[in-house]
Curated annotation (Swiss-Prot):
GO terms for biological process: dTDP biosynthetic process; dTTP biosynthetic process; dUDP biosynthetic process. This is Thymidylate kinase. It comes from Legionella pneumophila subsp. pneumophila (strain Philadelphia 1 / ATCC 33152 / DSM 7513). The keyword Translocase does not apply. ATP binds at G13, L14, E15, G16, A17, G18, K19, S20. The keyword Manganese does not apply. It comes from the Bacteria. GO terms for molecular function: ATP binding; dTMP kinase activity. It catalyses: dTMP + ATP = dTDP + ADP. CDD domains: TMPK. Phosphorylation of dTMP to form dTDP in both de novo and salvage pathways of dTTP synthesis. It is an enzyme of class 2 (transferase).
Length: 212
């Protein structure tokens, strides 16, 4: 992404990890440095992407939406987001802060759904053509604690209704992916909000220092 002047920062993690709060904090920190930002989310972020999100998240499609269909819908939404939102923003120097990206698919579909990682990687290569974030923060939280926090937000969506074993597989896969990709920054999200925000602030300030 050296030809693009903006930066893509991705916040990853299980339900209840505090991704939305982290996105808001990153935006605030960047704004203090007079950096123009936009935020987005996956799946979604575009008109088509939000329609696909409503399908993927809808509890009515429990036991109806095939895992392969879900995977393809996610990549369809991601392509639209990259081409319609992320790349145009990066090209004019804006920094994009995304709630989820490619790592979620590897963790949720590869780990949670037990899909073949080789297939996912091949699909990724075809759809994304090597497009990657400049910085990924993974908020690591115990699955049980994450679901308690998520439940406090209200009714569960189709993904949130999965078993706790599903989320443990995702959690384990995230850890494997972080070990395989040392550029991903893992932050302990089991701690207090103040401690988590302090860690995020340190990472972002260092990243800004090296990229301005």
């Amino acid at each position: 992404m050296s030809s693009l002047t903006g930066k893509l920062i991705v916040i990853e993690g299980l339900e209840g990890a505090g991704k939305s709060t982290a996105v808001n904090l990153v935006v605030e920190l960047l704004s203090q440095k007079k950096i123009s930002t936009i935020t987005t989310r996956e799946p979604g972020g575009t008109k088509i992407g939000e329609i696909l999100r409503s399908i993927i998240k809808n509890p009515e499609y429990n036991n109806v939406l095939d895992d392969r269909s879900e995977l393809l819908l996610l990549y369809a939404a991601r392509i639209q987001l990259i081409e319609q939102v992320i790349k145009p923003a990066l090209n004019v120097g804006q920094w994009v802060i995304a709630d989820r990206f490619e790592l979620s698919t590897l963790a949720y579909q590869g780990g949670g759904r037990k899909m073949d990682m080789r297939v996912i990687n091949e699909l990724s290569n075809f759809c994304l053509k090597g497009f990657k974030p400049d910085l990924t923060l993974y908020l690591d939280i115990n699955p049980e604690l994450g679901m308690i926090r998520a439940k406090s937000r209200g009714k569960f969506d189709r993904i949130e209704q999965e078993s706790i074993e599903f989320f443990h597989r995702i959690h384990d896969t995230y850890h494997i992916l972080v070990k395989q990709n040392p550029e991903i920054i893992m932050i302990d999200a089991n701690r207090s909000l103040e401690e988590v925000q302090s860690s995020i602030q340190s990472v972002i300030e260092e990243f800004i220092e090296h990229n301005l």
